[in-house]
Swiss-Prot record:
Pfam family for this entry, one: Toxin_12
The protein's name in its UniProt record: Kappa-theraphotoxin-Cg1a 6
Originating species: Chilobrachys guangxiensis
InterPro entries: Huwentoxin-1
Tissue specificity of this protein: Expressed by the venom gland.
């Protein structure tokens, strides 16, 4: 009884390792191609005209942020500038 359980666990372990290796091999080409894909997406998003940055969005100057938000100089994010209005 104990031997059959051990053999079953060993077979399941081998099958798991085999399936994992096959999956890694299958997914390997996708991982090599992904940096080029990400760079092309980055170029697309940088080329678009952007709206104002909302609360806690990254910024470099106050004009990047929406109304009533200002760019904090230390961490470069949009935060409330203390003004009220419509």
């Amino acid at each position: 009884m104990k031997v059959s359980v051990l053999i079953t666990l060993a077979v399941l372990g081998v099958m798991f390792v085999w399936a994992s290796a096959a999956e890694l091999e299958e997914r390997g080409s996708d991982q090599r191609d992904s940096p080029a894909w990400l760079k092309s997406m980055e170029r697309i998003f940088q080329s678009e005209e952007r709206e104002c940055r909302k609360m806690f969005g990254g910024c470099s100057v106050d004009s990047d942020c929406c109304a009533h938000l200002g760019c904090k100089p230390t961490l470069k994010y949009c935060a409330w500038d203390g003004t009220f209005g419509k």
